[in-house]
């Protein structure tokens, strides 16, 4: 269909300042403030198209402020974060603001509060249990870059970060990691994963909500504290609005991830 000829390109920049209030061997307190800018270019059959700006591009931005807390005690460690989002209309042109307003989105009134909590339990020297939860509540309609997403590295494994998102939402994850082989430079881990979440949005055209979850079994290879290679099997569940997700190889099938840390 026509959607096969539709492509997009995204550019995003984010700058942040962090203030460290307290740091010791057991806990850490900090606050942060940052600004994000996002630009989306749309193409149909290789040609730019959009009614919201010249050249087929849309641009938005927002400010983010919040605080972080982390601690560890014995075999447990945890960290928590709270933040607030405020849309910045100065990133968009007058025409783009007019088009956004037609869908009920006013960047100057786009606001949200969110937070996350993660807990790690080191059962013994080879087994670790990780639990995580996060959520966001929007007080008005948000621009796309301010939304809460269920995918990407911080969410459900195997789910693209932009696949399911909404103004408000929540997410929970649990992962058990067993390091069954290690030497001075490398380690092999086996890790079952389970997670699920829900997002919702309100627009002038109507309301939207979606729920999705995924389970996985992963084999992870770590080397020299730089390389991280994951290979496993992913299976989705609790798919509501987009049941065809379960038929995709990307949604139910082989999952790979390669990461290098500098």
Predicted regions and their residues:
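Transmembrane beta-barrel wall of Gram-negative outer-membrane proteins
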Residues: 1-71
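Outer-membrane beta-barrel "beta-signal"
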Residues: 219-221, 226-227, 233, 248-262
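C-terminal structured "cap/appendage" subdomains that terminate the fold
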Residues: 208-229, 237
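Short, glycine/charged-rich beta-strand-loop motifs at protein surfaces that mediate ligand recognition
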Residues: 202-208
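C-terminal outer-membrane beta-barrel translocator/porin domains of Gram-negative envelope proteins
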Residues: 41-188, 192-202, 239-249, 256-261
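A generic structural micro-feature
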Residues: 7, 57, 209-211, 248
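Residue-level recognition of beta-strand termini and adjacent short loop/turns
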Residues: 22-24, 124, 224
């Amino acid at each position: 269909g026509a959607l096969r000829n539709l492509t997009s390109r995204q550019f995003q920049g984010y700058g942040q300042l962090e203030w460290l209030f307290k740091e010791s061997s057991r806990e850490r307190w900090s606050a942060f403030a940052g600004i994000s800018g996002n630009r989306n270019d749309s193409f149909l059959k290789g040609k730019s198209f959009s009614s919201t700006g010249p050249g087929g591009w849309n641009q938005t931005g927002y400010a983010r402020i919040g605080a972080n807390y982390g601690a560890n005690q014995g075999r447990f460690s945890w960290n928590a974060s709270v933040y607030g989002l405020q849309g910045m209309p100065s990133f968009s042109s007058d025409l783009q603001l007019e088009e956004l307003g037609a869908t009920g989105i006013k960047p100057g009134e786009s606001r949200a509060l969110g937070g996350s909590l993660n807990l790690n339990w080191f059962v013994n020297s080879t087994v670790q249990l990780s639990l995580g939860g996060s959520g966001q509540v929007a007080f008005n309609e948000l621009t796309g870059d301010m939304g809460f997403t269920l995918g990407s590295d911080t969410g459900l494994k195997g789910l693209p970060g932009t696949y399911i998102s909404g103004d408000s939402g929540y997410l929970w994850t649990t992962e058990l990691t067993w390091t069954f082989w290690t030497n001075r430079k490398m380690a092999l881990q086996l890790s079952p994963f389970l997670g699920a979440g829900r997002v919702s949005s309100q627009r002038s055209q109507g309301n939207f909500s979606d729920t999705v979850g995924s389970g996985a079994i992963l084999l992870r290879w770590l080397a020299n504290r730089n390389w991280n290679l994951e290979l496993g099997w992913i299976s989705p569940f609790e798919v509501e609005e987009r049941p065809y997700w379960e038929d995709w190889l990307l949604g139910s099938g082989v999952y790979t991830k390669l990461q290098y840390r500098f």
